[in-house]
Amino acid sequence: MIKIVLNGCCGKMGKVITECASKFNDLQIVAGIDKFPYETSYPIFETPEDLNLDYDVLLDFSRAGALKGLLNLTEKTKKPLVICSTGFSDEDLALIEEKSKTLPLFRSANMSLGINLINSLLRKVTPLLYGNYDIEIIEKHHNQKVDSPSGTAVLLADTIKESINDETKFVYGRSGASKREENEIGIHAIRGGSIVGDHDVIFAGVGEVIELSHKAISREVFAIGALKACEYMGNISIPGLYTMDDVIGITK
């Protein structure tokens, strides 16, 4: 049995993860970390420093501001940390990269199987289409999401950029009077209502448009992905920065 400590257990995703965990025979949430606790089947600690029990995997589905405290705890326990939060700064990402040299860390901007398959497809199709097709990314989320563009949109944009043997640049939204340049990758964010998460990658050519689209119907898809990452990382002790590609067996 893999024992999980869930940071952000009282948030929207934390509650969904707690519910979904009961469907996994090899996983058990033994404790949570949250500043605003509510009644659960497991004990809740207000900060990582307060945690006083043993665990196998630390799962974070909260906000970027929790990162340093979680890394401090991970350095003490040497147990795997699964990072599912988004909104990290370049400094945060560099810190994760540095700490992964000595700790087993997992990070993904999106935990769904579908998004990660699309991300894998982008590595293959982008080199074939770039130059003849303009590339734009549109992401839509609920009106309570605080980071923009979404971590998933950034993930997809980075994959596209890395797949192109050219100097490309990101353009966030469009306004004013200016013509689109060939080497631009447009990224656009929409916020409204209760949209769980929609992502469209558009390759617009002459006479045709190719789209890769993903629509999340329920938060459960992210919860299941996070728990599968815990299953995978529960058997990992070697330092490194692991991703959903490792969990689902995608070869780059």
From Swiss-Prot:
- UniProt binding sites for (S)-2,3,4,5-tetrahydrodipicolinate: 142, 151-152
Query: Which residues of the sequence carry a binding annotation for NAD(+)?
Result: 8-13, 84-86, 108-111
Q: Name one GO molecular function term.
A: oxidoreductase activity, acting on CH or CH2 groups, NAD or NADP as acceptor
Q: Which pathway does this chain act in?
A: Amino-acid biosynthesis; L-lysine biosynthesis via DAP pathway; (S)-tetrahydrodipicolinate from L-aspartate: step 4/4
Q: What class of enzyme is it?
A: oxidoreductase
Name the InterPro entries for this protein. Answer: DapB_C, DapB_N, DapB_N_CS, DHDPR_bac, NAD(P)-bd_dom_sf
Q: Where is the active site?
A: 141, 145
Compartment(s): Cytoplasm
Q: Which PROSITE patterns match?
A: DAPB
Family named by the database record: Belongs to the DapB family.
- What is known about what this protein does? Catalyzes the conversion of 4-hydroxy-tetrahydrodipicolinate (HTPA) to tetrahydrodipicolinate.
* Alphabetical list of HAMAP family matching this protein: DapB
Name by which UniProt lists this protein = 4-hydroxy-tetrahydrodipicolinate reductase
